[in-house]
Amino acid sequence: MANTVHLSSSSLFIQTRGRKYNSILSFNNLQKRTVLSLSCALTSQGGKDMIPPKGKSNDRNFAFDFKSYMIRKAESVSMALNVSVPPQDPLAIQEAVRYSLLAGGKRVRPLLCIAACELVGGDEATAMSAACAVEMIHTSSLIHDDLPCMDDADLRRGKPTNHKVFGEHMAVLAGDALLALAFEHMTVVSSGLVAPERMIRSVTELAKAIGTKGLVAGQVSDLCSQGLNPYDVGLERLEFIHLHKTAALLEAAAVLGAIIGGGTEEEIQKLRKYGRCIGLLFQVVDDIIDVTESTEELGKTAGKDVMARKLTYPRLIGLERSREVAEKLRREAAEQLLGFDSNKVAPLVALASYIACRHN
């Protein structure tokens, strides 16, 4: 029986390297195996104990099984995503969409959305359409980010990137399709489950998180900073990039869950700050592992940020200080959870620790 969480942060890597899935049928088979691979990875690998940090929001007699929780949520999200993009005409675009959307991954953003919803009194069913919408947008951003005109990446989640399989033209359209589908899915599927005023607020939050006040702003700043002397750019600009390019969508995932779950304004704002902290934490750790892990371990090309002379935390302040920043952000995230029910908040406490300790 699992009393504490022993989760190697590399354990969520789904082994699909070296394979191409050019049909709906073959990718459906992959989808079925992904859940099994995720389960095996989480239950077979050891790692650093991830017990929620002690504090007012934690019961010392309660140990949360994060492995089982993450497996359950990943299974639920993957099944919901599979249903959301059925094979239909035109098959060419559907195959490209499904290839990236159903490629596994850690499902951190939908998990965060569901956990936030459950924390404030909602349930998984109510949060699922928003959780799927966030993952669709995240996948859209990855497809576009990997394009030759952006990061020019060959691998994503251990597989050839979307444009390597389907061509640049189809990859652009797949990303566009997912962006539109996210809002359609969230509003149509949630109809009758979420009060209209809360849905309108949720749509506004999500749109803001991915536009010129969020993800796009971060991407533009990142592109404009490439090749510059990091000391001329500075830490403030680096934080702006990461808060917008990465943290904005994670923050939105938490906020959407809290809004849809019926949270109070105080609860929504606490979870907003939590999401922002773990969002920045996610990117700081991503910067660290880009220079400390191999391509095989990452499931994507290692060292690309260095080769592109991108502005990163290790490049600006070094590895040790970057690790200190990561730990500080983990603590700040945990502080936002004080005052919530200790059992209900356990997934979010464990999630912050998982992000801080991950290797891919």
Curated annotation (Swiss-Prot):
Keyword annotations of the record: Carotenoid biosynthesis, Chloroplast, Isoprene biosynthesis, Magnesium, Metal-binding, Plastid, Transferase, Transit peptide
Entry's cofactor comment: Binds 2 Mg(2+) ions per subunit.
SUPFAM superfamilies reported in the protein's UniProt record: Terpenoid synthases
Catalytic activity: isopentenyl diphosphate + dimethylallyl diphosphate = (2E)-geranyl diphosphate + diphosphate; isopentenyl diphosphate + (2E)-geranyl diphosphate = (2E,6E)-farnesyl diphosphate + diphosphate; isopentenyl diphosphate + (2E,6E)-farnesyl diphosphate = (2E,6E,10E)-geranylgeranyl diphosphate + diphosphate
Residue numbers binding Mg(2+) 2: D145, D151
InterPro entries xrefs: Isoprenoid_synthase_dom_sf, Polyprenyl_synt, Polyprenyl_synt_CS, Prenyl_diphosphate_synthase
Pathway involvement of the protein, from the record: Isoprenoid biosynthesis; farnesyl diphosphate biosynthesis; farnesyl diphosphate from geranyl diphosphate and isopentenyl diphosphate: step 1/1; Isoprenoid biosynthesis; geranyl diphosphate biosynthesis; geranyl diphosphate from dimethylallyl diphosphate and isopentenyl diphosphate: step 1/1; Isoprenoid biosynthesis; geranylgeranyl diphosphate biosynthesis; geranylgeranyl diphosphate from farnesyl diphosphate and isopentenyl diphosphate: step 1/1
CC terms in the record's Gene Ontology section: chloroplast; plastoglobule
Keyword Flavoprotein carried by entry: no
PROSITE patterns listed in its UniProt record: POLYPRENYL_SYNTHASE_1, POLYPRENYL_SYNTHASE_2
EC number: 2.5.1.-, 2.5.1.1, 2.5.1.29, 2.5.1.10
GO BP annotation list: carotenoid biosynthetic process; farnesyl diphosphate biosynthetic process; geranyl diphosphate biosynthetic process; geranylgeranyl diphosphate biosynthetic process
Family per record: Belongs to the FPP/GGPP synthase family.
Purpose: Catalyzes the trans-addition of the three molecules of IPP onto DMAPP to form geranylgeranyl pyrophosphate.
Annotated protein name in UniProt: Geranylgeranyl pyrophosphate synthase 12, chloroplastic
Protein's organism: Arabidopsis thaliana (Mouse-ear cress)
